[in-house]
Amino acid sequence: MNVGIMCGSSDTASMESRLNNSRAVSEIADMGYTFVMGAGETGSMRDVKEIIRENDNMLITVGNRLELNRTTADVKIEVGSTFERAGHIYENSDVIIFLDGGTGTLSEFCSFLNNKIETDDKNKELVVVNMDGVYNKLIDDLKRKYKEGLASNTLTYFKEVRSPLELKAYLEEVEKKINGSEQERERVR
């Protein structure tokens, strides 16, 4: 299963944020997934990639030429913009995890959520890792928009988890669902 990870790349992020992101990834790093990420090598992105590499997971990175020259990965995909990067991460992932991050992470979540709604994409799973309530305001705002008729019930298009163990359990569910779908397709052939 390919797991996209979206997280902050700022070296000025709080230690608490970086540790929470690392704890979440440490919990799933031994599950044999292929991870898909931006090519940045700073902040939480660097921390997360170190955990992925230490566990010998396959890593696909997406970024511009300069970023790709500074990173090590099993597969490198060169793109010209952050929009292209996000699109490649979306397309190359079965599930996308949103860890604590900055405006880029929030923007990508909103973009991916909107795409999932607009295309009725039932094959892509979006997961918000809401440890310490870092996404509470965003989720509350989505609830408000639905209540006021400004948006559909967007909460049905992503899963919120609050701990690394809950993340691991949900990814196991998703993997079973994907494997079941693949087995069903093979049976029909």
What residue ranges belong to the model's regions?
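Short, charged/polar "capping" segments at the starts of alpha-helices
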Residues: 13, 67-70, 134-138
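Amphipathic helical hotspot of TIR/SEFIR-family domains
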Residues: 106-116
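Glycine-rich, charge-decorated loop segments at or immediately adjacent to ligand/cofactor-binding or catalytic sites
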Residues: 42-47, 134-146
